[in-house]
Amino acid sequence: NPTVAPNPTKAPAKRGQVLVARAKAAKTSVALSWTKVNGAENYKIYGAKNNGKVKLLKAVSGTTRSWTQKKLKKGTTYKYYVAAFDSYGRITKSAVIYTNTTGGKKADIKKVTVNKKAFTLKKGKTATIKAKTIASKGTFKKYTSNIRYVSTNTSVATVSKKGVIKAKAKGKCYVYCYAQNGLYKKVKVTVK
């Protein structure tokens, strides 16, 4: 009898990948979406009212990149984060994002703008992304920095809390510039 080769064990996905979650609120629901994590076998969505304790709301497959929470209260602040898992455990998670359901006096971020969509830098040089947010009508309350920045490959380029890119090594990466509700602009960085 020929011997049957065992199934090769799937290698663990690369840890620390960037995962950006986004919330789009309606009156009684919040639609969540998120960026792809390579090797993810499932995603778990956690959330709560802003003053509540975050708990697991839903687990979805690794091919799913959106989910909507329904039956929420209008004009209320909710917080969420998304985590990606494989059979070895958690690969990565997003930062906590905050959004306000409509129908009340609370505003939400409706647009993010950046001064440049791409930067080409020599190793060791720096450049600054100037990102701005535009809120909807109403009272806007900040729960995080106005814009948060994250590099998809910190060995190529890092980015500071103020949007200063530093070129580290030859290659390409992206910087996500995202508002507290996860709305983002993606900036390409090329290091020569």
Give the positions of each predicted feature:
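Extracellular low-complexity, O-glycosylation-prone stalks/linkers
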Residues: 40-57
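Short S/T/G- and acidic-enriched coil/turn segments that sit immediately N-terminal to beta-strands
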Residues: 63-68
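Short solvent-exposed strand-capping/beta-turn motif centered on an Asx-Ser/Thr pair
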Residues: 37-39, 87, 134-136
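Short proline/glycine-enriched turn/loop motifs at strand-loop junctions of beta-rich domains
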Residues: 37-41, 141-144
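Pro/Thr/Ser/Gly-rich low-complexity, intrinsically disordered linker/stalk tracts
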Residues: 2-39, 74, 90-104
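Predominantly extracellular/luminal cell-surface or secreted proteins
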Residues: 46-50, 85, 150-152
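Extracytoplasmic soluble-region selector
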Residues: 104-192
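Beta-strand-rich modules
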Residues: 69-90
